[in-house]
Regions:
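Helix-to-loop junction immediately C-terminal to a conserved catalytic motif
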Residues: 51
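Conserved ABC transporter NBD signature motif
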Residues: 59-69, 75-76
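Conserved ABC ATPase "signature" region
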Residues: 100, 111-126
Length: 307
């Protein structure tokens, strides 16, 4: 297996806070690697270390076979591009002028590549419209076009769909898949929006409080996820009381929605809830979600998704 990135026992300390604590991971060539973790789990800190914005307190990583403390690491980083938190764009410039500026910074000729990149990210028809008047999704896609100006074969995206509307999420998903499949770009995506990440990733790294809990590929994850009942009710507290009384294994996805993993008769459960004056709004059999799998990995509780 060809490997783009290997992280070995990486640590980052801020006074008394451990942002990363012995984190290790491997990103195979050609993968869409989903870095899964709640806000504050260390995802953005890792990306800052990989891009050279910060230095690790301990441990190391290898990028294209070059260790981060070796002379060739900056050359290796030129094969990588990253968008951290929000894309750096000039809001008073058009999409085309933003790309021209990026090519100037890189010291590369620009005109031949601009039209191709604008078309690739779906911004070919924006004309004289300034980036400041773009939607959030358009600005995110412009950020990716700027990141692609140096022709990288490894792209790091930090929360690329955070804050996007449904149409923007679909457009971003299609773009990420196109970059991976048609341009063979390896992509590392940091995200806490797991329902969307599950539609993209070929590999996953689940992190919690700065350390790696588990690495797994998509096929292994599919095999590991269990059958379950997904239930939406009128009163989540009553549902929990009923399930506890039945000694059921369950996980809440939201205040009134839960996945139940115990083997039980649906009619028995519905009757018990009716007796407790808890209305069942929806019930369906399905595979365990990526979200509940992560909750199970880190030991229970509810997965908190900041909006």
């Amino acid at each position: 297996m060809d490997v783009i990135l290997t992280v070995n026992g990486l640590c980052k300390y801020y006074k008394h806070d451990k942002a990363l604590s012995g984190l290790s991971l491997t990103v195979p060539k050609g993968a869409i690697y989903g870095l899964v973790g709640q806000n504050g789990s260390g995802k953005t800190t890792l990306i800052r270390l990989l891009t050279g914005l910060q230095k690790p307190s301990d441990g190391n990583f290898t990028l294209y076979g070059i260790r981060n403390d070796e002379k060739g690491i900056e050359k290796a980083r030129r094969r990588m591009s990253a968008i951290i938190e929000t894309p750096a764009i000039y809001r008073d410039m058009t999409a085309r002028d933003n790309l021209r500026q990026q090519y100037r910074i890189l010291g590369q000729p620009s005109e031949s590549g601009i039209d191709e990149l604008l078309h690739l990210v779906g911004l070919g028809d924006t004309g004289s419209k300034k980036a400041g008047h773009f939607s959030l999704g358009m600005r995110q896609r412009l950020g990716i076009a700027i990141a692609l100006a140096g022709d990288p074969d490894f792209l790091i995206l930090d929360e690329p769909i955070n804050g996007l509307d449904p149409q923007g999420i679909i457009e971003m998903r299609e773009l990420i898949l196109k970059l991976n499949r048609e341009r063979q770009i390896t992509i590392l995506i940091s995200s806490h929006i797991l329902a969307e990440l599950s539609k993209l990733a070929t590999h996953y790294g689940f992190i919690d409080h700065g350390h790696m809990v588990k690495e797994i590929d998509a096929k292994e994850l599919e095999a590991a996820c269990r059958k379950c009942l997904r239930l939406t009710v009128s009163d989540g507290k009553t549902l929990a009381t009923v399930l506890d009384g039945m000694q059921a294994e369950y996980c809440f996805l939201s205040e009134k929605e839960a996945e139940i993993y115990s083997d039980m008769r649906v009619t028995k459960l519905v009757c018990a809830l009716a007796e407790a004056d808890c209305e069942v709004l929806s019930i369906q059999e399905r595979e365990e979600s990526l979200e509940s799998y992560y909750i199970r990995l880190i030991g229970g509780g509810r997965y908190e998704q900041a909006v």
